[in-house]
Amino acid sequence: MKNLERLFAEKLLKIKAIKLQPANPFTWASGWKSPFYCDNRKTLSYPSLRSFVKFEITRLVLERFGQVDAIAGVATGAIPQGALVADALNLPFVYVRSTPKDHGLENLIEGELRPGMKVVVVEDLISTGGSSLKAVEAIRRDGCEVIGMVAAYTYGFPVAEQAFKDAKVPLVTLTNYEAVLDVALRTGYIEEEDIATLNEWRKDPAHWETGK
């Protein structure tokens, strides 16, 4: 396991951004029930951790993608993270809505991109990958090239990994499900018996049910 994955997992657990509720699962926008929830937006309320996330995402953008013309954040969770990274890199920033505004200019992309720009998308969390890749499609329709995506966290579902592969979008993340579970177990945040529930959910999250 990479040091960054473990380190960020430790930081998320320290601020209680990881929630485990097998008996009272969370419902995601996709409709999936989940005993596990990562609320990494809480990092915004901790200045030192906010700076850590900005620095590490910025570093990954530079190391993995080289020449970048603009940063795009996926609304709403990745707007602040994306803006911080764009500021650190002195690059233009835009954010992509899930749906166009129903008034005014009815924009889907807020900000200005020019055709031919090389864009890196910043996302706060990857689950199924659906909303993230819709943002990619919107940017491509504007005539820009999406050269990659950096996310703070991913659940690492096979359906998402395949979707990113099909869309030809390289994805890098600060941490992931496996790293969080490993650190959570070692630090006593979860118990061994919790692992079985979490593993059952991970195998088939679309059909997982409480107590099954």
From Swiss-Prot:
Residues bound to orotate: S127
Any one GO BP annotation for this protein: 'de novo' UMP biosynthetic process
Keyword vocabulary terms for this entry: Glycosyltransferase, Magnesium, Pyrimidine biosynthesis, Transferase
A GO term, aspect molecular function: magnesium ion binding
Requisite cofactors: Mg(2+)
Annotated pathway: Pyrimidine metabolism; UMP biosynthesis via de novo pathway; UMP from orotate: step 1/2
Primary enzyme class: transferase
EC numbers, comma separated: 2.4.2.10
Binding site for 5-phospho-alpha-D-ribose 1-diphosphate: R97, K101, H103, E123, D124, L125, I126, S127, T128, G129, G130, S131
InterPro entries on file: OPRT, Or_phspho_trans_dom, PRibTrfase_dom, PRTase-like
Keyword Metal-binding in record: no
Entry-linked CDD domains: PRTases_typeI
Role summary: Catalyzes the transfer of a ribosyl phosphate group from 5-phosphoribose 1-diphosphate to orotate, leading to the formation of orotidine monophosphate (OMP).
Subunit details: Homodimer.
PANTHER family: OROTATE PHOSPHORIBOSYLTRANSFERASE, URIDINE 5'-MONOPHOSPHATE SYNTHASE
Protein name: Orotate phosphoribosyltransferase
Species for this entry: Bacteroides fragilis (strain ATCC 25285 / DSM 2151 / CCUG 4856 / JCM 11019 / LMG 10263 / NCTC 9343 / Onslow / VPI 2553 / EN-2)
